[in-house]
From Swiss-Prot:
CDD domains: Ribosomal_S15p_S13e. Belongs to the universal ribosomal protein uS15 family. Residues 1-16 have a biased composition (Basic residues). The gene is rps15. This is Small ribosomal subunit protein uS15.
Length: 152
């Protein structure tokens, strides 16, 4: 696969080993893993970071193998509402930081171009999430409104 806004190939990465049951070294029960996921979310971690913490600190290679559910589903079952998908939220935060930079440094042409590329990714991703029903159909990218919502 190639990159969206660059003329180069992507990076190859390692593949996860196929297994249909949790490894024998995992000593936490599914209930304990769910409790740990909620605890980490309440500490302020995003779902991807929760998975990395569980992998690195607790030796759980995959939450889905242990519990049978993804982290998002565990959070949803316990009444946690995630307003924006994590990848979209990260792009919005990046765009807002770049806008703040461009307010101070108005002639920074290179970063103005970078902002255009980031916002193109946001529009592309938001149209995908609108099709899938994750975002409302009338949702629009408005940086001024999102600055307030994302900062909460």
């Amino acid at each position: 696969m190639a990159r969206i806004h660059a003329r180069r190939r992507g990076k190859s990465g390692s593949k996860r080993i196929y297994r249909d049951s949790p490894p024998e070294w995992v000593d936490m029960s599914p209930e304990e893993v769910e409790k740990k996921v909620l605890e980490l979310y309440n500490e302020g971690y995003e779902p991807s970071m929760i998975g990395m913490i569980l992998r690195d600190r607790y030796g759980i290679p995959s939450v889905k193998q242990v519990t049978g559910k993804k982290i998002q589903k565990i959070l949803k079952e316990h009444g946690v509402e995630i307003k924006y998908p994590e990848d979209l939220k990260a792009l919005i935060k990046k765009a807002l930081k770049l806008r703040a930079h461009l307010e101070v440094h108005r002639k920074d042409k290179h970063n103005r171009r970078g902002l255009q590329l980031i916002e193109a990714k946001i529009w592309r991703l938001s149209s995908y999430y609108k099709e899938k029903g994750v975002l409302p159909a009338d949702w629009k990218y408005n940086p001024d409104r999102l600055k307030i919502e994302i900062s909460k």
